[in-house]
Amino acid sequence: VTYLIPPVKKASAATSGKTTEAAAEKTSAHHPRRTEVNEPLFGKWLSNVKVTSNRLAGTCFYVVSGHGGPDPGAIGRVGKHELHEDEYAYDIALRLARNLMQEGAEVRIIIQDAKDGIRDEAYLSNSKRETCMGSPIPLNQVQRLQQRCDKINALYRKDRKKYKYCRAIFIHVDSRSKGT
């Protein structure tokens, strides 16, 4: 299966002198450009996101970090440090979500941790407080996957009427330090 992100609109001869961004804004009239978005999940220092482009206006992404809650995913070790997959996947998911927002996309962060935010530490400490948009994450793997599926589908039923392009992005990280 191949997924394509919508192409950036290029200025044609008819729009010469206008920037690609201006052309994208014109085609996205029902998605007015926001200048800033506030997302507390990014952490105290990064919660305000400056929207620098409108090229992803009209798109909606469901960003899902792997594991979380009672399931840390793969666990690797570096010296005395344990590396828990869910913490790194969550950090990467937040960074991706923030970048998508800077480009004008609407982003739904499915797995959430109100405390962690985007972290700069080399070794991220583990926690079990992640939720699926406020709901506790089940221990049972099938229930966990079903919970995420149900949440994304419920959001999509509403979002597909408003956005021309909706996609889910799932992030997993293998933190084992030796070959598989």
Outline where the language-model segments fall.
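Catalytic-site microenvironment of enzymes
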Residues: 1-180
